[in-house]
Amino acid sequence: MEVKISESAFNTRVEKLQGALNTHKDAFGGADSVLLLIGKGGDDNPYIKTAVAQNWLLGYEFFSTALLVTPKRVIFVTNSSKAVHLEGLKKDDKVEVWVRPKEGGKEVMEKLAKVAKEAGNKLGVVVKDKFRGPIVDEFEAALKDSGIEKVDIEVGLSHLLEAKDDDEIKSIRVASRASTAYLTKFFTDQMLGIVDEERRLSHSKFSEQIENKLQDEGFFAQNQVKLGSDFHQTNLEWCYMPIIQSGGKYDLRPSAVSDDANLHGGTIVCTLGTRYKGYCSNVGRTFMINPTKAQEQNYEVLVGLREKVFDSIKVGAKACDVYNAAVSYIKSKAPKLEAHLLKTIGWSIGIDFRDAKFLLNAKCQREIVDGSTFDVSLGFQNLTNSAATDPKNKTYSLALVDTVRVTRAGVAVLTDSAPVALSEVTYFFEDDDEDAEKEKKKKEQAKKEKKQQQAAATVSSITRTKLRHEARAEDNNDQKRKDDQKALHEKLNKAGLERFKNTEGALNGEEKVVIKKFESYKRDTQLPQNLLKDLRVHVDTRSQSIILPINGRPVPFHINTYKSGSKTDEGDYVYIRLNLSSPGQIAGSKKDAPQVFEDPDAQFLRSITFRSRHVEHMNDVFKQIQDLKKASTKKEAEKKEMEDVVAQDSLVEVRARRPLKLDAVFVRPAPDGKRVAGTLEIHQNGLRYVSPIRSDHKIDVLFDNIKHLFFQPTEGELIVCIHAHLKNPILIGKKKTWDVQFYREASDMAFDETGNRKRKYRYGDEDELEAEQEERRRRLQLDKEFKAFSEKISEASDRKVDVDTPFRELGFHGVPFRSNVLLQPSADCLVQLIDTPFSVITLGEIELAHLERVQFGLKNFDLVFVYKDFNRPVTHINSIPVDQLDAVKDWLNEVEIPYSEGPVNLNWGSIMKTVVADPQEFFTSGGWSFLDLESDDEDQEEEESEFEVSDDEPEDEDEDSEEFASEDDSEGDFDSEEESGEDWDELEKQAAAEDGEPPRKKR
C-alpha cells in the first residue's frame, strides 16, 4: 500500500487517451493502439515522452513495464512486485494486469503483440525514445513477424497533455511559488551580498548553493511563503540545475549551464525552476548593477514586450501569432533589438518541462486552448554596452522568464511575485572615487599578502582572505548573540520584578493541611465474627485493618495507622512488634511528609509487641500485614499519580457520513501492550483509534485536549508518525500518558530480495535499483499520506490545533532520559518523537536555559531548562556534543530564550527552593544573573557528566522532584514496570532506626 494510484484520475485520463485515438487521428499518426513501454531505469532525463505519459496516467514511473491502450482494452505487463500496486485499477473490466514471469516473458509479450494486432496494424509509440532491458527485447522479438507498423505519437501526446485539470494546475502553482521564493528570498540576497562585499564565488558554486537550499525544510516557513496546507517538501524537486550567468558570457537557451567563472557585478541573469509532484515551473530575472541609461531603456522595452506577449496569449490564438506580435512590438519600439530577440519565446510546460511540439515561435501553427500553461521566456541575447569601461560589461543579455496559465478571461501569471519593474532589479553601489580608493586598498592588501606567502607558501592569499572573513563573521555573530542575550536577560529580570512585585514570602504560600481520614468499621457489629473467636491477631483484608487483642477485646487498627514492624524468633516463641503512627514522629524517609492528625492531643498507641507460640500463624499474620501495607502504599501512589487525570468529554461521532480514516497505523502507548495495526478516525470533536482485535479497545483524543500536534516525516527515520501532546493526561489501559502517537513503519521487508532464488538467474543490480526506487516511493507516499491526514485533523478542529513539523537540520543529540537521541526544534517546541519515552518541551513555558560543563577539554556539555512555573522541576538534557554548542546557542537566541553558561553542574534542587521561597527577593537581588558568575561557593561537582545509565534524573533532585507531575517532559509512564511503595526491608530499617536498634543483616 506504499504506492497509491488515483483510480479516478487514471480512468479519466485513459478514457481521454482512447478518445483522442479517434478525434486526433492525424496527431496520433493513425495509430489503432498506443504502447508505452519503459525498460530498465538509469536514464537521467526525466522528460522522456513515454515516461511523461506514463507519469501522467499513473502518477508514478514504473520501470520494466508495458502499457498497451486500445479503444476497448487497457493492459499492463509488469513483474509481480509492481502488479500489486496496479491491482486497484482492475475494478474496471477494461483494465487487465498481466504478470511477467521471473524467468522471462516471451509468451506474455507475444500475447500482448497479438492484442495490439487485433486492434489494428498501426501501433503508436514515441519513436525517438529508446529503452533497453529484457522486456523491451522480448516485445521487439514478438513484433518482428507480426506485420504491425510503428507510428510516432509524440504530437498526439503533446495535444493530450496540453490542457491541465484542477489538480495539475494546483501543482504547477505550488511549484511556481517555490521557484519564485528561491529566486527572491535566497538568490537575490546572496547575490547582492557577494557583489557588495566583492567576494569571489563561481557561477557553478553559487548554483550548487541554490540547489542545496531545497533540503532546507524550514526555508518556506521562515520566509512566510504560503504553499498550501497539504504541501510537502519531499514532493519538490529541481527541474534543472539553476542557471547563473554574468561577466559578458550569456546563453539564454534552457539547456545552458552555469560555468566556473566568478560572479561579476554587472548584468546578472538567473533562471531556475522547480517541479512539484512532477509538474514543472520556471522563472528567470535579470539584475543590473550600476546600469547605463541605454541598458535601462532596453530593459524597459523588454518589460513592455512581456505585457504585449501576455495580451497575445489567448484561447484560440496560434503560437506563431504570439511570436509575430512580439516581433511587431519590437519593430515599433526598438527596431535595433529585433536581431537580438530569441527565436523561441516560450513553450508548453507541465509534467513535461519543454514540449518540443508546442513552441512559441514563427513556425508553430498550434492553437492555444483553455487550461494550458506556458513558460514564457523573453530575452535579448548579446547586446553591446558601448559606454562600459569594464571589459566584462561590454556584452550583456536581458531575460524575463515566467510561468503562466491560460484561461478564457486571459493570462494568469503564476510567478507574478518575482520582481519585474526596473527599480526592483537595478542596484547602485559606489562611484569612481570609491573605486579608486578601494583599488588602492587592494594594492596595499596585496603587498601584505605577498609577505605572508613567504612565511607560509602553501596558503594562498584567497584562502587567507576567506578565513579572515569567516573569522570576522564569526566574531560579529558572537557579539550580536551576546548583545541579544544581554537584552533578553534584562527583559527577563524586569518581567520577574513586575510579576512578583506584590508577592511576599514563599511562592506556593501556605500549603493546605490535608488530614487523612480513614475508618475500619462504623459499628462494632461489623467486625468479622469468624476472626473474633480465639482473640488472636488477625488481618481483615476487606476493611484494610489489623485486629489486635488488647485487654481481652478485639481492637481494629486501619492499615494507614501502621508504620512499620519486625518479627523475631526466640526459642519456642515468636515476637511481633508493630509500630504505629503518632504525632511528633520524624518521617522515616525524606520523601515522606510527617502525618497530620485531626486531634494531636488525643491518646495514641505508638507501638505494641505480641509474643506467641503459634509460629506458623504469626508468620502468616506478619506476611499478611506486610502485603496489605504494600498494597495500600501502592494504591495511594497510584491515586496520587492519577490526581491530574481529568475526565474527558464524550467523543461526538460523525453520523451523516463515514469518518475520515487512516488505516494500518500503530499506536504508542499500545492498549494492553499489544502492537497491533488499527484505524485512526476523525470525528466531530476529536480522534478515535480503533483496534481490530477488540472493539472495546478504543483511544479517544479530543481536540480541546491537544496541546501540540506534530507530523514527523520519514527523512532519516524508520517511521512516519502523527503525534499528539496533550494538555491533560489520559488513561490508556491502566497507565497515564501525556502523549499519544500514531505511526507506520517506513521500510518494508517485503522488498528485500537479497539472497533469494532470484540471485541464481540475475547477475545485475536491477533488483537493487528497483528495491531502492520502491523504498523511495514508499517513503514519499507515506509522508504525503500522513501529512495530508494531519492537515485534515487541523481542519476538522477548526484550526484549534495546528500541525507542527520538527526541523531536522536544527536538531542536536543529547540524553534527556537514558538514551542518546536526536532532539529537534519545531516552531513551538523542542521534541524527540521517535524513541520512548518521548520528549516534548514547550518553548513558551521556558524561563531560561543554562549550559553546564562548558569548559575547555570536555567533549560534552549539558543543557538545563528552567520553567516559568518555578514549582516544576527543571529539565536536563545531558551529554550534548560540544561541537554543537554554537548551534544550540544560535537556536536559543533565535527563539528568544535567554541562556547562561557555566563550567560545572549546579544543584538545581537547592536553587529552585531558594527561588520559590521568596521570588520577589530573588529578582530584587539580581535574579538569574548569578548563573554567569564564576563562584566556588556553590555545592557543585566537577565530573564528566551527571548522566548515569541507572538514573533518570540527577540524584540531588530526587527528593525535590517526585512531588511534581512532569508534563512537557513526557516521561512515558507506559514503559515503566516499577512497583510503587516501599519494600519491607526498608520499612524494617525505619522501625529499627526509631527503636535505636541497628538493622539486622540479611543472611
Swiss-Prot record:
Residues 440-450 have a biased composition (Basic residues). It comes from the Eukaryota. SUPFAM superfamilies: Creatinase/aminopeptidase (SSF55920). It is found in: Nucleus; Chromosome. Residues 436-486, 930-1003 are annotated as: Disordered. Residues 468-486 have a biased composition (Basic and acidic residues). InterPro entries: Creatin/AminoP/Spt16_N, Creatinase/aminopeptidase-like, FACT-SPT16_Nlobe, Fact-SPT16_PH, FACT_SPT16_C, FACT_SPT16_M, Pept_M24, PH-like_dom_sf. GO terms for cellular component: FACT complex. The keyword Electron transport does not apply. One of its GO terms (biological process) is DNA-templated DNA replication. Keywords: Chromosome, Coiled coil, DNA damage, DNA repair, DNA replication, Nucleus, Transcription, Transcription regulation. Pfam families: FACT-Spt16_Nlob, Peptidase_M24, PH_SPT16, Rttp106-like_middle, SPT16, SPT16_C. Residues 428-460, 622-648 form a coiled coil. One of its GO terms (molecular function) is histone binding. Belongs to the peptidase M24 family. SPT16 subfamily. Forms a stable heterodimer with POB3. The SPT16-POB3 dimer weakly associates with multiple molecules of NHP6 to form the FACT complex. Component of the FACT complex, a general chromatin factor that acts to reorganize nucleosomes. The FACT complex is involved in multiple processes that require DNA as a template such as mRNA elongation, DNA replication and DNA repair. During transcription elongation the FACT complex acts as a histone chaperone that both destabilizes and restores nucleosomal structure. This is FACT complex subunit SPT16. The gene is SPT16.
